[in-house]
């Protein structure tokens, strides 16, 4: 369970704060799903064991905490009116930050996603 999510973003001149905030929140939610839950599982012959959403674990709204978002006060000479692209940049730092938090908690840094509770338990036991 993720208890708190705080994200800093450099979007240059933020022309539409609500839209930019939504972009960051969506990217963080997607990244939490990728870091903790989502995994394509294969059988021994290479067949997909998780072909439908009933068997493929994705985060629910209850799995995603509110995200505090702080925008850096910068400007970009190349962007329109000083804006920078946000696209999916919020996605990139989430898994490494979570891996560092897990290392701080149990002394071992996971190097594989998803960082499921089973994998974390094995890491903590020295099994992984």
Where in this protein do the model-derived segments appear?
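C-terminal catalytic domains of large/alpha subunits in multi-subunit enzymes
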Residues: 1-128
